[in-house]
C-alpha cells in the first residue's frame, strides 16, 4: 500500500539493504532485539539513528552501531500516537540543531514533542507513557461513578472524555497551572 501511495519510495524486507543508503534509520523494535538488529547494519557516521527501543541508552546504541560519533536520537512516543496525539519525548546525542528540528518536525505530525536530556527520559516516560494509563484509570472511575448515578455508559464515557480534552486544552492553550484552572 505504501508503495502504491508513494511510488518513489523504495521498500524491502532486508534491513541491511534498507539502511545502506538511508539518511535516517528508524529502529522501532523491542529493547531485547536492538543489538541483533543494529549490529549487522554497519551504519555510517553520516547517517542519523533514531531508536524507539525503550531503556536502551546512547552509549549502548553507539556501541551496537560501532559509530560513537554518529547522531543518535532516542524517541519515546506514547500510545496516543495512533490518534496523532502523542506526547513524544526526544533525546539527542551528537545531533545538530538542524537534525533536532527535523526529528521534532517529523514527530510533531503525530502530536507534540519535547526535547529532553537522556538523564530525564525515565522520569518523563513515567509521566507521558504511563500517564496515559493513569488518565484512563481516572476516566474509568469517573465513568463508573456516572453509571452508578444513572448515566448510560456510552454517555458517561463521552462526558468524561470531553471534560478531559477540555481540561487539556485549557492547560495547553493558556499555559497555566492546573490550580489556576481549578479555582
Residue map of PLM features:
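Internal alpha-helical scaffold of NAD(P)-dependent oxidoreductase catalytic cores
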Residues: 60-71, 87-124, 134-175
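Short acidic-hydrophobic, aromatic-tinged amphipathic segments that line or gate anion-handling sites
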Residues: 10-15, 114-116
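NAD(P)-binding Rossmann-fold cofactor-contacting core
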Residues: 1-5
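C-terminal binding/interaction regions
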Residues: 183
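Rossmann-like NAD(P)(H) cofactor-binding subdomain of soluble oxidoreductases
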Residues: 14-90
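Phosphate/pyrophosphate- and phosphate-bearing ligand-binding catalytic cores of soluble enzymes
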Residues: 128
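A generic structural signal for alpha->beta connector loops
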Residues: 8-9, 46, 69, 110
